[in-house]
């Protein structure tokens, strides 16, 4: 994932941050895997793109669980894009009125060698 973000011109602690601490209630913090295009001002944390990274989501139930986790983080961060990624692919959800679990675009890692597909994904994240 990080080599992909780097190849799109985005770098850690400048454009994205890992494990951004977010206050989620009194004394409770959560740590999304990646926040892209972020502001880490305390108590006002924001990220335009929220990325939840898993090793391998082997079935629909695991994708659903990852989506629900990412959506809760995205709501707190006011994100407009969620990405679930694993060793096979990236699943991109774009917020319309809300995030719809059934409305997404899937990108397999090998497809991103195609310039058009790479640029399509980059444009979705360049917000």
What annotation goes with each model-predicted range?
Residues 1-81, 89-127:
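A short, conserved, highly charged catalytic patch centered on acidic carboxylates
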